[in-house]
Amino acid sequence: MQKANPVSLRSSIIASGTLSTRFLVGFDTKATWGELVNGSILDCAPEELRGKCVLLATTDQFRASAALIVLDGIARRVVLFPPDVSLDHLAYVANTAEANVLVTDNAEAANAQHGIDQILMYSRTVTPVPVDRGEQLETEWILLTSGTTGQPKLAVHTLGSLADSAWETRPNAASIVWSTFYDMRRYGGLHIFLHAALTGTSLVVSSALEPVADFLLRAGAHGVTHISGTPSHWRRALMSPWAGRIAPEYIRMSGEIVDQAILNQVNAQYPYARIEHTFASTEAGVGFNVSDGLMGFPPEMLTRNPKIEMKIEDGTLKIRSTRTATRYLGSKSPALKDTSEFVDTGDTVELREGRYYFTGRRDGIINVGGFKVHPEEVEAVINRHPQVAMSLVKAKKSPITGALVVADVVLKPLNGEKEADALRSGILRFCSAELDAHKVPVAINLVPMLTIGESGKLVRRHA
């Protein structure tokens, strides 16, 4: 039986403050939070969805956000299907989540083979609906995360686990305008959406339809003061000639390892901003924020928050808190937590000179003749080269060592033309001075760009 819940997203937004002066701003539309909590974009009365499992498969962040405000507290379960996930997985996700309603603005998704009988298309506008919603249920929020078999894993959260860190902070919101490079169907973007919604601030959401330059211009025009993204998001933003069109007071980086190069570069571009990097994951939730301007984190960070238990075990960070997901859906899914209720993040760390440093993902190691190489460690060195904008280190198959290290490198715009061979040689010398021999790339490929997924992370393909 679905548990009653005195708090819903809608009621929490109402409690957060004045609703008529705060906005949710999309790519092509905007609305006040007041309009959103008293309206709906769904083509049915909200009560018709009571107790149902609703799968959101949309192309538009604004309308997905508006739907969540309606559905939390009414639906039994809401599944966020990110637009970058192939529709080939739609039937699997729908079946695993026991979805019986599909809400979409995508005709291809509506016509796909998914086994869902009730399909609702979005309205283009927010329509006022009756305020009395009846009893509020504790809705399960289902977030998709990558799986080793190719099928996504479905992590189960509640509003309480997702919003815990937002409820922890109540800033003076009058002058704050949040934004994020993330998509709100992913944990990083959803966290910022909830933070803005529950702390009384406006939010400008990004769109996959607009280039980085256009988003920066739009964010600047709306006076964004607080903004988040992955290190890859920020490297791409800094390559844009319009990076200076935003003047943030606060910058947050998360989702990937934050190296010293990107911290320094962002600080140089935005010297008046407070810069933090955050450890968070879909399964573990928000762990901690680091604000001292240095990569890595001090050991005391593991015990700073009494609500969050963290430990390093076998070189991997593990977390136990009320912010973690409860389980994965699906009878064949792995356990999300161990027997002590800790989430194994899969992120490896190393203690050096009194500070912990993230070294990479446990499942992303390159094996070079029996020696382990974390791609992120090599990238951190390459990214410190003064002429490098960003890099991607990967494995190349070798009949002798099993694998070799190679790197794709994007250069910063140069003042003068330099020979490609000279640049490659310079980067290799830079690596040789900093890394053990087996970690030095055997080849440097100069490329115009690197692929960044909708998650904001570099797309890594293992050899």
Predicted regions and their residues:
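Conserved AMP-binding/adenylate-forming core of the ANL superfamily
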Residues: Q2, S11, G17-E48, L90-A91, ...
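Conserved AMP-binding/adenylate-forming
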Residues: L42-D84, T180-D183, K372, L411
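Conserved AMP-binding/adenylation subdomain of ANL enzymes
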Residues: A163-V177, R185-H226
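Gly/Ser/Thr-rich phosphate-binding loop
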Residues: H226, L238-F297
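AMP-binding/adenylate-forming catalytic domain of the ANL superfamily
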Residues: L435-K457
